[in-house]
């Protein structure tokens, strides 16, 4: 006897979806579902052996399809194909499935045939099914007993049917309704399968790195399938016996038509179809082979990206493919200008891994976190059929290569800044007396030097000298002129230089006119490019120091002497720095350098005092500092006149001989080398060579000043005679200095530096261990 029985619609409007006959169950999905192919359902008695032995009645289970679990198909043909693949018959897209009472048959096998279905429609529908979505398996099931419908061996491969202990517990859950198991109430049994679903483009909110196949249907209604090729390889294999049944990739799902018109799906013997399982939640979940419904977007494609890759596209966040979360595992982003993926109708869509397009600049990389990817800078990319963008332009077609004119601020030529006076910061009128000054400071300095004024500061010699307040304190203004380097001799020297250049130019022009064959003009005297020793001495000359003497307090010998000692200590320090800068001096032995400084410190201070007094006060006053000038009134103080008389002698001799600045620098250097120990220096030969060098420099300075060779030797004799006389002046000054240093009753303070020098020098002078280097014999 044939175990199959046709499933035909009833002739009455029966809302029940379950019809029971003697040898099997006939399932009717309402009247409104008719109009398509007829489903033949046969029930095998061996499929549910355990259930038939326990109860002779039919146990009814509800089929619950959560809302949103199946995507809405817009075409009626596609909906029919979906219904056929699931073993159901649906007439319209908006048709509702009434699943109040779905019973399990006692025997027979379920088979599927489509004798009245259009073959061409089936081929197109099955091809579309490969891109559609189906119901995933509930991850919360714990491998309880599952019922698999086994069709004929020629049509479908066999599936396994296991009945666990949980299914045996269903007997205890039967109510009074004929022993049937009711999992849901009547109002919960009606639901929509193909409803217009609005799938969100975002992730359903599942945990990261969780398989989309394990989505909870009861919690997330929008969760569908995800591409199997995008997941790990474990999803492509057959699950273990203890794991849930996962959809498999069929090698060939193209339908085959037998001679009698039945539809046959070919598959290998070792591949099992998805099973209809009974879960812990006591509902039946239908699982079909994993397919993906791929939406047809205009020119936007999906691109796979592994963690660490950089994808620069229109969207930087993970998207969901038709409602499936892609936040776990691989991520799919919208990208631009990627190749379209060629798909076959009998295969599932495979998302190939496409390398990301290199980004445009390193700055974008650093902002987006480029990882360890090696990127190519924008401008070197060359994609066929794609416009190459250059740096700085959005598109060559939108903005041609036009050289933008430079900004007016960068090209605007501003004139040179006005030159300022080095004394009062007013606008300078030129270089006066060797310094860039204004006309007012020029006249002031000339009158101050020639008028022999004795300026005294009413403050602390730190008055502000500017354009407005330059007339408030002449003493500070005069001090600032000296600090700037103003010198009356600079004007005369400049005139001589200009006169010499004019004479040389005139001589060259005359020679050129006499010899017209000469095309190259060579000056008679080429300027010396190598700096002379005199020019170096001018550079290293120490600045004028201030004593810090308060002129508002009544003068006294003790206060003046103490101030002079403090000033002398700072001048000694400046003299040490100056000596080390003299060319050749540092080549001497270190002990020789210290010895020469200890013997000559008073020579240097006295000669510099005479020069300042000669240049600033015409040798009538002693200009120790701009703020400490000893006039005739101060010279009359006790113990002051005799010492001032010796110092005025030096100033008067310089004034009488009209010593030039170059001559003064050479003479000052020779005074550093004017005294040595009787035993000689450790580097005596080098010392003699250095001393002879500066004697020759003094002769050059004399020739430069006089110009007439007949008077050069005479002037050299006068200047060297002055150097010899300095020994007597310094000897008198040292005797008075030693006396005040040893006499504690005078209470004259000495700075530490000066006290150390005097302490080391006293034994040498007392023993007579000093040799004077004189130019002339007495």
From Swiss-Prot:
**SUPFAM superfamilies per the record?**
Glucocorticoid receptor-like (DNA-binding domain) (SSF57716), Nuclear receptor ligand-binding domain (SSF48508)
PTM annotation (Phosphothreonine): residues: 8
Omega-N-methylarginine PTM positions: 23
Q: Name the principal localization, coarsely classed.
A: cytoplasm
Name the reported effect of residue 210 to E: No effect on nuclear translocation or transactivation
Q: Where in the cell is it found?
A: Cytoplasm; Nucleus; Mitochondrion; Cytoplasm, Cytoskeleton, Spindle
What outcome follows a substitution of residue 762 to I? No effect on nuclear translocation
Alphabetic keyword roster: Acetylation, Chromatin regulator, Chromosome, Cytoplasm, Cytoskeleton, DNA-binding, Isopeptide bond, Lipid-binding, Metal-binding, Methylation, Mitochondrion, Nucleus, Phosphoprotein, Receptor, Steroid-binding, Transcription, Transcription regulation, Ubl conjugation, Zinc, Zinc-finger
Q: What induces it?
A: Binding activity reduced by FKBP5.
* Compositionally skewed regions (Low complexity) per UniProt: 134-150, 394-414
Q: Which residues bind DNA?
A: 421-486
* NR LBD domain boundaries: 525-759
Q: Domain of life of the organism in this record?
A: Eukaryota
Crosslink feature (Glycyl lysine isopeptide (Lys-Gly) (interchain with G-Cter in SUMO2)) location:
258, 277, 293
One matching Pfam family: zf-C4
Which PROSITE patterns does the record associate with it?
Answer: NR_LBD, NUCLEAR_REC_DBD_1, NUCLEAR_REC_DBD_2
Annotated region Modulating: the residues are 1-420
Instruction: Report residue spans for region: Hinge.
Output: 487-524
Residues bearing N6-acetyllysine are 480, 492, 494-495
The family database entries (SMART domains) matched by this protein are listed as: HOLI (SM00430), ZnF_C4 (SM00399)
State the residue spans of region: Interaction with CLOCK. 485-778
Q: What does this protein do?
A: Receptor for glucocorticoids (GC). Has a dual mode of action: as a transcription factor that binds to glucocorticoid response elements (GRE), both for nuclear and mitochondrial DNA, and as a modulator of other transcription factors. Affects inflammatory responses, cellular proliferation and differentiation in target tissues. Involved in chromatin remodeling. Plays a role in rapid mRNA degradation by binding to the 5' UTR of target mRNAs and interacting with PNRC2 in a ligand-dependent manner which recruits the RNA helicase UPF1 and the mRNA-decapping enzyme DCP1A, leading to RNA decay.
How does the record comment on the protein's domains?
Answer: Composed of three domains: a modulating N-terminal domain, a DNA-binding domain and a C-terminal ligand-binding domain. The ligand-binding domain is required for correct chromosome segregation during mitosis although ligand binding is not required.
| Protein name (database record) | Glucocorticoid receptor
State the species of origin. Saimiri sciureus (Common squirrel monkey)
């Amino acid at each position: 006897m044939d175990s199959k029985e046709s499933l035909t619609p009833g002739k009455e409007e029966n809302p029940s979806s379950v019809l029971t006959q003697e040898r099997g169950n006939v399932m009717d999905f309402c009247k409104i579902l008719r109009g398509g192919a007829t489903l033949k359902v046969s029930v095998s008695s061996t499929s549910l052996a355990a259930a038939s032995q326990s109860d002779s009645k039919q146990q009814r289970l509800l089929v619950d399809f959560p809302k949103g679990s199946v995507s809405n198909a817009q075409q009626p043909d596609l909906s029919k194909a979906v219904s056929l693949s699931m073993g159901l018959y649906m007439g319209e897209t908006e048709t509702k499935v009434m699943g109040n009472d779905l019973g399990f048959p006692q025997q027979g096998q379920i088979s599927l045939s489509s004798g009245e279905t259009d073959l061409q429609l089936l081929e197109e529908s099955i091809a579309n099914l490969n891109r559609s979505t189906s119901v995933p398996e509930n991850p919360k099931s714990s491998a309880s007993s599952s019922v698999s419908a086994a069709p004929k061996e020629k049509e479908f491969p066999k599936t396994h049917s296991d009945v666990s202990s949980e299914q045996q517990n269903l007997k205890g859950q039967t109510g009074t309704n004929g022993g049937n198991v009711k999992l849901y109430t009547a109002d919960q049994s009606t639901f929509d399968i193909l409803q217009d679903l609005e799938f969100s483009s975002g992730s359903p909110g599942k945990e990261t790195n969780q398989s989309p196949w394990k989505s909870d249907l009861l919690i997330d209604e929008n969760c569908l399938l995800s591409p199997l090729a995008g997941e790990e390889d474990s999803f492509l294999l057959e699950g273990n016996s203890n794991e849930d049944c996962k959809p498999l990739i069929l090698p060939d799902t193209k339908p085959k038509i037998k001679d009698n018109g039945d539809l046959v799906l070919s598959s290998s013997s070792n591949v099992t179809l998805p099973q209809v399982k009974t879960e812990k939640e006591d509902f039946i979940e239908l699982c079909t082979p994993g397919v993906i419904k791929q939406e047809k977007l205009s020119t936007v494609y999906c691109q796979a990206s592994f963690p660490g890759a950089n994808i620069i596209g229109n969207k930087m966040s993970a998207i969901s493919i038709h409602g499936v979360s892609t936040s776990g595992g691989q991520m799919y982003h919208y990208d631009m200008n990627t190749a379209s993926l060629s798909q076959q109708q009998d295969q599932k869509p495979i998302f190939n891994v496409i390398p990301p397009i290199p980004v445009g600049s390193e700055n974008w990389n650093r902002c987006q976190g480029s990882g360890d990817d090696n990127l190519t800078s924008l401008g070197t990319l060359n994609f066929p059929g794609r416009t190459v963008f250059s740096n700085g332009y959005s598109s060559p077609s939108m903005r041609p290569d036009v050289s933008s004119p430079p900004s007016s601020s960068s090209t605007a030529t501003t004139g040179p800044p006005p030159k300022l006076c080095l004394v009062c910061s007013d606008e300078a009128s030129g270089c006066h007396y060797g310094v860039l000054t204004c006309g007012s400071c020029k006249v002031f300095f000339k009158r101050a030097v020639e008028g022999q004024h004795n300026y005294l500061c009413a403050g602390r010699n730190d008055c502000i000298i500017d354009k407005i307040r330059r007339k408030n304190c002449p003493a500070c203004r005069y001090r600032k002129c000296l600090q700037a380097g103003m010198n009356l001799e600079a004007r005369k020297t400049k005139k001589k230089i200009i006169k010499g250049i004019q004479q040389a130019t005139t001589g060259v022009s005359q020679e050129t006119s006499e010899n017209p064959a000469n095309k190259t003009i060579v000056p008679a005297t080429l300027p010396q490019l190598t700096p002379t020793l005199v020019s170096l001495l001018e550079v290293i000359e120490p600045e004028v120091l201030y004593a810090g003497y308060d002129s508002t307090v009544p003068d006294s010998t003790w206060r003046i002497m103490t101030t002079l000692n403090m000033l002398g200590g700072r001048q000694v320090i400046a003299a040490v720095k100056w000596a080390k800068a003299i060319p050749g001096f540092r080549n001497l032995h270190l002990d020789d350098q210290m010895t020469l400084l200890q013997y000559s410190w008073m020579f240097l201070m006295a000669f510099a005092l005479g020069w300042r007094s000669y240049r600033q006060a015409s040798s009538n006053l002693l200009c120790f500092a701009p703020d400490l000038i000893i006039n005739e009134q101060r010279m009359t103080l006790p113990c002051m006149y005799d010492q001032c008389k010796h110092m005025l002698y030096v100033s008067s001799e310089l004034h009488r001989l009209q010593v030039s600045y170059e001559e003064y620098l050479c003479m000052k250097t020779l005074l550093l080398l004017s005294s040595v120990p009787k035993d000689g220096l450790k580097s005596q030969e080098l010392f003699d060579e250095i001393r002879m060098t500066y004697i020759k420099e003094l002769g050059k300075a004399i020739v430069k000043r006089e110009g007439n060779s007949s008077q050069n030797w005479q002037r050299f004799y006068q200047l060297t005679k002055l150097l010899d006389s300095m020994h007597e002046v310094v000897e008198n000054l040292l005797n008075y200095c030693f006396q005040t240093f040893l006499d504690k009753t005078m209470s004259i303070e000495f700075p530490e530096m000066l006290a150390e020098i005097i302490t080391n020098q006293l034994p040498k002078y007392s023993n007579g261990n000093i040799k004077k280097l004189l130019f002339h014999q007495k």
